[in-house]
Amino acid sequence: MSDFENKVAFITGAAHGQGRATALALAKEGADIVAFDVAKKIEYPAYSFGTSDELKRLKEEVEALGRRCLIAAGDVRDDKSVTDAVDRAIAEFGKIDILFNNAGICAYATVDKMTDEEWDAMIDINLKGPFIVTRRVVPHMMEAKSGVIINNSSVMGLRGGNRLSH
């Protein structure tokens, strides 16, 4: 039996990329998934995000693996959408064993060209977002006296990159 058998994983930024890959990997190991993603275009940055169609496809793929998947469209910056998703997860699964804070953005700009709005969006999603989600999940983990929190980040935290002023 896998260490993840019958665990419930709440994953932000789950619609594509690392979030999607993690959701599928955990489902293959026996975990049920709460897939949380903004599932729409946001104001910054200028690249694509997960879509509601991608969330639906992820749900189908997780269920094809014999696991349950709750999809929740929401923004990690919005306490109400996070609270609603956590409440739905608890109502559906009764617990959250794993929190994978994966949602994040990157603003491609040099410091002299980055706008305040780009900076604020990046800080709010990459720093405040994990705080908001963790704050809403932790009470359930504390009640269960069990839980794992993983905060994902970028290799850019270890070394700089071209046009990455953060």
What name fits each language-model region?
Residues 110-111, 118-123:
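Substrate-binding pocket helix/loop in short-chain dehydrogenase/reductase
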